[in-house]
Amino acid sequence: MESSTLNENTVNNYIFTPTNKNDLQTAVDLWCENRAEAQNIYGLISNWNTSLITDMSNLFLDKMYFNDNINNWDVSSVTNMTSMFDGAFEFNHLLNSWNVSSVTDMDEMFEYATLFDRKNALWYNFN
């Protein structure tokens, strides 16, 4: 799908479905650098279908100003969330709808995510 052919209605209804971490990382990087361009290419980040992704480690690493709602992401296949929000200082959205039962590694997932409210991820052990 070429971004030049997308109209606003198409963009808002388009669901990006990355098949691997690199595709997802590329989309996240662009979203954090140029939201308008990313939205034209990938649609709204809150609508992305992440059900095929198994590794989200470092996904928002040092994305200091990232603070978008990704509570609807399907993370049920993810096994690695190490440092996922490490350095995402401003991130503070609910993640309570996430099914993290497959995750085996959450080390430093919210390291330096200083504004993150622990109540937004009741499944996470902050010890």
Region locations from a protein language model:
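Negatively charged
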Residues: 1-127
